[in-house]
Design a protein with these regions (language model features):
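Active-site-adjacent structural elements in enzyme catalytic cores
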Residues: 1-141
């Protein structure tokens, strides 16, 4: 999927500002978030310019206290992007020091919250009435 940018929210309270969400999708999200999931939804017209030509947006409410506290303190969701590489899982995608070494000239800040998990999040496409697991990861439905 081309949609490699996601929005990290503190909770689901302002979800309709970023995505169009059906009742069934909202219930599924409410049951499993915060957690290791990315839900792909149709975009709302209120999204930032970076999403202007996109029809879908990934929504995340991770079960990570550092991330959620950062979002809550900012008062707004943040955009996130997964580290992509040809390798499946490599050490520098989970080690904060190695992430900093590799990306220090491409990112403004790396927050050291310890080593990350090696298992990716579960991605669920909720753009139609028939939800589809795009990638099975750590999250179980």
């Amino acid at each position: 999927r081309k949609n490699n940018l996601s929005i990290i929210c503190y909770d689901l309270s302002n979800l309709s500002e970023y995505a169009k969400v059906s009742n069934a999708a909202f219930k599924l999200m409410k049951k499993h978030l915060p957690g290791p999931f990315t839900f792909i939804l149709p975009t709302s017209s209120e999204l930032p310019k970076i999403y202007k030509n996109r029809k879908e947006v990934g929504i995340r409410v991770p079960d990570n206290n550092i991330t959620r506290t950062l979002v809550q303190s900012l008062g707004n969701p943040i955009l996130t992007m997964s580290i992509r590489d040809e390798d499946e899982v490599i050490e520098y995608t989970t080690d904060p020091e190695l992430i900093h070494e590799k990306y220090e000239h491409q990112v403004d800040i790396v927050i050291d919250g310890g080593f990350g998990g090696l298992e990716a999040s579960t991605v669920i496409d909720c753009t139609t009435d028939n939800f589809e697991i795009v990638r099975q990861g750590k999250g179980e439905l």
